[in-house]
């Protein structure tokens, strides 16, 4: 079993989490290991298109302590989060129960009271 929290959970089942989560989710799927995300779906995030990924300064990966670690021609991008598609997620564990990622809209229809 592989589990993680999520910084953002869109209603279409896409999640945003720290860099590396997408790669681990791919490996989990490949090796048949279930991946469960813990968190509360974001009501205003209907799809992956609503997830904004902050881009960090690429110089942070092109140098170490101000010393370049690559040739000047190399360019980089440095996103702060990965987006994981729902087909890699076995379920989303919420305060109202476990949901299939493709059915997260049902979370907002549920009459179960929140625990917080």
Residue ranges with predicted function:
Residues 1-116:
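Conserved phosphate- and dinucleotide-binding cores of soluble alpha/beta proteins
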């Amino acid at each position: 079993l592989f589990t993680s929290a999520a910084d953002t959970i869109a209603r279409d089942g896409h999640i945003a989490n720290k860099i590396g989560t997408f790669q681990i989710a791919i490996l989990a799927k490949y090796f048949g290991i279930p991946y469960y995300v813990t968190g509360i779906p974001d009501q205003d995030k209907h799809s992956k298109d609503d997830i904004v990924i902050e881009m960090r300064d690429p110089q942070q990966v092109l140098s170490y302590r101000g010393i370049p670690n690559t040739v000047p021609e190399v360019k980089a991008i440095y996103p702060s989060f990965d987006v994981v598609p729902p087909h890699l997620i076995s379920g989303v564990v919420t305060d109202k129960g476990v949901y299939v990622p493709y059915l997260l809209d049902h979370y907002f229809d549920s009459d179960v009271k929140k625990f917080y």
